[in-house]
Regions:
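Short alpha-helical transmembrane segments in multi-pass integral membrane proteins
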Residues: 61, 66-116, 170-237, 283-340, ...
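Helix-terminus/linker motif at the lipid-water interface of multi-pass membrane proteins
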Residues: 121, 125-143, 212-219, 277-286, ...
């Protein structure tokens, strides 16, 4: 008899399965591939494969009760035999209970992750090109624009809470096929985004001197930063609108349109920056202010492309303005109830990061320049990773909204570990080409060595950090917006902030040690987040279909969750 995989032959006292033993396929859950194929394997070999391959859809109860006979005699003796049989049966049960094979899930993830990652990578690449162009003007310009980017990131923290709430509701309503819920959720999200954009536009345009004085004490950097920030503030409304539209399109799995818009935006940004920074084609050389004008034009182009393509492709929901802003007080209350932990998290973490950046911004000029370049490289990693995080949000939220909670959990942990693996690959890829990248961005001497040290530290901790990030996004998409948010806020202000300020202000520690302490909480949070993931308590649907099945799911796993009743 031919041995099976892992040295196990399919010899036993039980009969091999026949076609009558196959479990019927359920529409929407079981793939059709392999149903019509005639296998070349013998019946015994097929039975062995039941415990090994998720593509063989036999009754998992038969698989779990099957007792294999091992090729090697030592494995057939007790207690080794009992242990291996138990492990084999558990493995067979696990495989047969898995509704979606990893290959199928991977294809679904890639369909969302690759366009989103490409869009984000293009955007980050555009920022790198900006940095390279500004690097030809000097380290002062690079550092000043980098500090302005931190103010933009604070705006990102301010509106990302509403983005997270919008993705939660839209993805779950998408799984439920609730068109009215999708439109109203998008309208609520867009209204709050507009309010945040208005506040930051005012601060950037009317109070740029105050903003720059918060971030740095260097007068040279303040002068360049004020000029840049006063202009780039007008890009914020278009930037936020593009993000809102892209969020809706991603949540309904129409990811190619934002990708095309991102490509046009990057090309526009790079072209305009080259012309306006250096004064080409008869235009005056505007320096850092030219980069700000390029950002404005790029974001306008992004919005126009998304609107035109959505209209041409007859994309639902995006342009149905009347349906966006109807009466929906109950939904607004529920939206805010689910979103406020995310909003609180993003605002407080944004403030915490600003406090960290203030510490990092009051270092030597070489360290400030190194930090600006590092943030650009970090953006590459986050852009690459965020595509997979977006896939987790959409694919898990969709199944929770449809009431398929077992499938949601199965997708969640697979995608989370995939996110971590891709993050590690991305970090190693950037680290392998660090020399030409750092030299191209105008770093040399101390600033070069500092930036390299920062990225080496980040390579070690980045995989853990992105694991925490992807788990938090997954919990939010499933309706649990509080756990990860509370955990992150607590560790930021109870551990990270004291550690950084004590090291910097009291002990005057080296810059790289202070930087490393920015991530001191990540390993501890990872352990806590993993425990919460396997508890399954984070599945809290907002859709009617999801709520209809959550009771049986919780009863099955003995889960007790206190939730406020929807109004």
């Amino acid at each position: 008899m031919a041995p099976g995989r892992l040295g196990c032959s399919a010899v036993s006292g039980q009969r091999p399965p026949t076609d009558s033993d196959r479990v019927p396929f359920t529409a929407g859950h079981w793939p059709d591939r392999g149903r019509e194929k005639k296998s070349d394997k013998t019946a015994d070999q097929q039975w062995s494969a039941v415990l090994l391959w998720p593509d063989d859809f036999y009754d998992f109860k038969k698989a779990a009760s099957y007792t294999p006979s091992f090729k090697y005699p030592i494995l057939n003796k007790e207690p080794a035999r009992a242990l291996f049989v138990k492990l084999y049966q558990v493995r067979g049960t696990f495989i047969m209970q898995t509704k979606t094979t990893f290959r199928k899930l991977l294809s679904m993830v890639m369909a969302i992750a690759i366009p989103v990652a490409l869009q984000n990578l293009l955007s980050t690449t555009g920022s790198m090109v900006d940095t390279i162009m500004l690097g030809r003007l000097g380290e002062t310009e690079v550092g000043a624009v980098g500090l302005c980017a931190q103010f933009t990131n604070l705006m990102f923290s301010g509106y990302w809470g509403f983005i997270g709430g919008g993705m939660m509701f839209i993805s779950q309503y998408w799984g439920e096929h609730n068109e009215e819920g999708i439109c109203r959720s998008y309208g609520i999200m867009l209204s709050f985004l507009a309010a945040v954009a208005a506040v930051f536009t005012y601060l950037a345009v009317a109070m740029p001197e105050w903003v720059m004085s918060v971030y740095t004490s260097s007068e040279a950097m303040q002068k360049v930063g004020v000029e840049y920030l006063h202009t780039v503030g007008w890009a914020y409304p278009f930037m936020v609108l593009a993000v809102g539209m892209s969020t809706l399109l991603r949540s309904i799995e129409r990811v190619k349109i934002p990708l095309v818009g991102g490509i046009v935006a990057v090309v526009t940004n790079c072209t305009c920056n080259y012309i306006l920074i250096f004064g080409k084609l008869g235009f005056p050389a505007l320096g850092a202010r030219g980069a700000a004008y390029g950002t404005i034009l790029a974001n306008i182009a992004n919005v126009l492309v998304i609107v035109i393509l959505a209209k041409a492709c007859h994309v639902p929901f995006l342009l149905e303005i009347r349906r966006h802003f109807g009466k929906s007080r109950g939904l607004v209350r529920e939206f805010l109830a689910k979103s406020y932990p995310i909003i609180l998290n993003e605002v407080l973490i944004g403030v915490g990061n600003m406090m960290i950046n203030i510490v990092l911004g009051h270092q030597a000029d070489s360290a400030i320049a190194a930090t600006a370049v590092f943030r650009t490289l970090e953006g590459l990693i986050i852009a690459f990773f965020s595509g997979f995080s977006s896939a987790a949000t959409v694919l898990v939220g969709k199944e929770v909204g449809a009431g398929n909670h077992e499938e949601a959990f199965s997708r969640a942990y697979r995608i989370i570990y995939l996110c971590q693996a891709m993050t590690l690959i991305g970090c190693l890829a950037v680290l392998s080409i660090h020399a030409p990248l750092l030299h191209a961005m105008g770093l040399s001497g101390d600033s070069y060595r500092t930036c390299l040290g920062m990225f080496m530290i980040y390579t070690v901790i980045g995989t853990i950090r992105m694991g925490n990030w992807s788990m938090n996004d997954t919990y939010r998409s499933a309706g649990d917006s509080a756990f990860g948010s509370l955990l992150e806020i607590t560790f930021m202000f109870a551990m990270v902030q004291p550690a950084i300020h004590i090291a910097n202000d009291l002990f005057h520690a080296p810059f790289l040690l202070v930087f490393a302490l920015c991530y001191v909480d990540e390993p501890i949070r990872y352990i806590i987040m993993q425990t919460h993931m396997y508890s399954r308590k984070w599945i809290k649907p907002v859709s009617d279909a999801g709520r209809a099945t959550i009771g049986a799911f919780r009863e099955k796993y003995g889960i007790r969750v206190k939730e406020r009743k929807a109004s």
